[in-house]
Structure formats: structure tokens, C-alpha cells
């Protein structure tokens, strides 16, 4: 039985991780975020009530769960407090069940200013960031000039460090990007106001998780974004600024990698992407590509970013990119989400290879974005189904064509589909193998 489960996205994010984490945390004691920031958007629907979380782990709606934000997460105190407020208004005791690593890098207003100024300066070559300061905060961390949560509790030292780093960044804002500088006094005052609010939630995450492991507590690690957005393994440079893959769990939480158990890869029954970057199986982007099936996927699937509200680009399932995600993450099993969105389509396609300009046929996706751009997808066609799969809770409720589609994805990837999601609510799910019982 696996006590430690990793849940991560295998595509370009927005795969439906939040729902699955919420579902599986019925059996968990801890849910841990280990990378990213409030650029994530995890949507939960429980008894018809919708909750969107960006920074707080998706287990917060479970009374039995303690939630942890690990050191690999870049933390905006302002965003965190704004996210906590409506949850507390609903009677959820967030401060009693949410804990934060003192080593989390802080996102402060100058990071946001830098992020937005850079995107504007890039023009039509913009990466498509959320503009929330994620990348600049990670840059400060790597350059060893970043401020961390633990720094908030020494006002004198914090003020000195802040002054130095803001002089550095304001110089770039004014002289390179030609925008207004960020006020040091305002940032300092705001940051100091966070110290008293956060102090009760700050813990030694590594020690807490190790003690939990020794007790036999069940721990779930919740990934944000998706494998193909990983800073090292994604479609660089159209990626996020953190390691979204299974390898990021240990580094971003301080939990020993040898203790990780089942790794669940969340994948949509089709593909979506938000923002810029290559997308070989793309059908619809709302601009140049207007394939009606792609539009159907976006409309029926409600494909708008939970964080940005941006229209998601849509396309067919890509087994080639999935094979790369499986290699990187050593998946134990997959969860196929939004199967019901395919209802009513007469014909389905699965990308089984990339035809490259040099005549070669790739069965595993390349690393660089440039190589992705030149790939022409090779499709295998399968019959669709007219029956309604929405809300199905057993395999017996699925039409044979849907079962064939699921089986074909398993055959093409070599990984079992252990969970099938047929709707947004936590109970609209078919669980073949439970990760905590695998």
C-alpha cells in the first residue's frame, strides 16, 4: 500500500489535478504543494459549489487534511491572504490547517512589475506568463538575492536586504524597461504587515513530513501546471519557471525521493494549452485556427484558464508528448479527465508520431520548442460515440467505443489508466485502482 502519492499534470497544465487531489484526499493526512505559485489554478466542484484555488493546496476543503506549502513554491503573501479570506468566510479554519515553509521565496510587488514590463517589451514574442511575478521571484532565488518567508521575522535585516534588491530591480525598470520604479517604503510597510499574519503558519516542513512518514500518515504531493511546462523538460522557452515534474517533489518539499510511492499522471482525453508555444495537435485557438471540433472541445470543456481567464487552445490527444511525460515522471498510472467532452463526436484522432522535416518519424517528443514547431502529427483515427458518459461512475456505464479509446491510449503509452473523470464534481469519477491502495 502506497502512503505517499504524487499527483501531477502530464500535458501543458489545466488537466484537472485539483478535482483529483480533492477526491483522493479523503484518505490523506497531508497535501503538499512543492512548486509554482499563484499562477496555478485548481478548480474544485463539490455538490455543485465551485472553488478555485491558486496557492492553497486542494485538500483544504477536507476537515481531515493538513495543507503544506513547501520551499519550492514562490509565495505571494498578498495573494495568499486574499485567497484565505473567502474560505475563512465560509467557515473553513484555514489558519489552523495551512502551514508554510520558512524557505519559500517571497513574491513582492517589484517582481510583478518586472514580469509585466518584460512581457510588454517582448511584443509578439511574449512567453504568455500570468504576469504575477513568478519568474522574477525564481530568478532572485537562483541568484541568491531573493527574500524568503523566514526573513520577514527580522525587520532590521529584512529592510536592509529589501533595499539592496530593490535598487537592483528598480534600476532595470527605469533604465531598461522605461517604466516607473516601485516604492521601497510601500513594499517594506506592506511586507512587515505580513509577518504577524503568517508567523503561526510557518513550520519546518522537512521535519514535519519526515515525522508523518514515520507515523505512517498518508501524504499527497500536489503538482501545479504540467510536465510540458517544466523549466528543464518542457517546450523551452515557452515554459514556467519551476520543475513541474516528479523530480521536483523532493527538491520542493524536502521529502526524501526514496520514500515517494505511487505517481499519478493527470491527462485530459484531448489536449489544451494556454498562452504561447508549440502545440502539434492544435485544432482551435480562437484566432487563426478555427476547426469546429477544436471549438467543440473548448466550448463543451469550458476551456478558459482558472487563473488568467484566457481561452485555452485545443487539440487531439498526443501520445507522442505523453510518452515523454511518462519517461520523465516514471508514472505508476494515469487519470484520464474530461472523457465526457468527447461525447457526440463521430470520429476521434490520436497522435501516434511526429513526422519531421528531415523525413524522420518520432515516437517520443523532442525537447526544444523549435523541433516541436516543425513536427507534423501522424494520426490514428477511431470511431467516437453518441452516448452520454457525463457523470458515469462505473466502467459498465461507458459505451464500448469509449472503452476502446481508453484501451488504445493505454496500449500506446504502456501505462494503465487507473482513474477516469466524467464530470467536474468529485463523485463523477471511475476509480479502477486507488493510488493509496496500489
Curated annotation (Swiss-Prot):
Its EC number is 6.3.4.4. The active site is at residues 14, 42. The keyword Repeat does not apply. Coiled coil: none annotated. IMP binds at residues 14-17, 39-42, 130, 144, 225, 240, 310. GO terms for biological process: 'de novo' AMP biosynthetic process; IMP metabolic process. Pfam families: Adenylsucc_synt. Substrate binds at residues 306-312. The keyword Glycoprotein does not apply. PROSITE patterns: ADENYLOSUCCIN_SYN_1, ADENYLOSUCCIN_SYN_2. Binds 1 Mg(2+) ion per subunit. GTP binds at residues 13-19, 41-43, 312, 338-340, 421-423. It catalyses: IMP + L-aspartate + GTP = N(6)-(1,2-dicarboxyethyl)-AMP + GDP + phosphate + 2 H(+). Its main location: cytoplasm. It comes from the Bacteria. GO terms for cellular component: cytoplasm. CDD domains: AdSS (cd03108). Its cofactor is Mg(2+). Homodimer. Plays an important role in the de novo pathway of purine nucleotide biosynthesis. Catalyzes the first committed step in the biosynthesis of AMP from IMP. Belongs to the adenylosuccinate synthetase family. This is Adenylosuccinate synthetase.
